[in-house]
């Protein structure tokens, strides 16, 4: 694993969540897994590790980030696939306005270029980019933060998602 990547456990711990300067997101709601649109492939090793952690906990700790207009996943591809493997039918999401200027996308790798338009076109066409191609950021008090900073702890029992 690369140094700058958080372990699964650390990613699911509580975080300070300062609010964005404008309303770029909505509260948590539940969406059927099949309604969501993906734009990235997943890493099978990470998927299996995440699935096992969720099963061990017996709860889902965090929602995923989704565009409210297209249902494109902004953050949470691996979580979606883990829940599918577990047999869940729906998932808690935070809906974001992907067109908001507060939301930006940057590549994980320096030698790549990625735009919101590329992500939307890829997802709507049913195609996938390589794993960890995009990193969705949100402007909070003049500073770009990873969108997961707004993903609240929810601790929902898995049977509520089946």
What spans do the regions from the language model cover?
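Short, charged/polar connector segments at secondary-structure boundaries
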Residues: 2-69, 74, 80-162
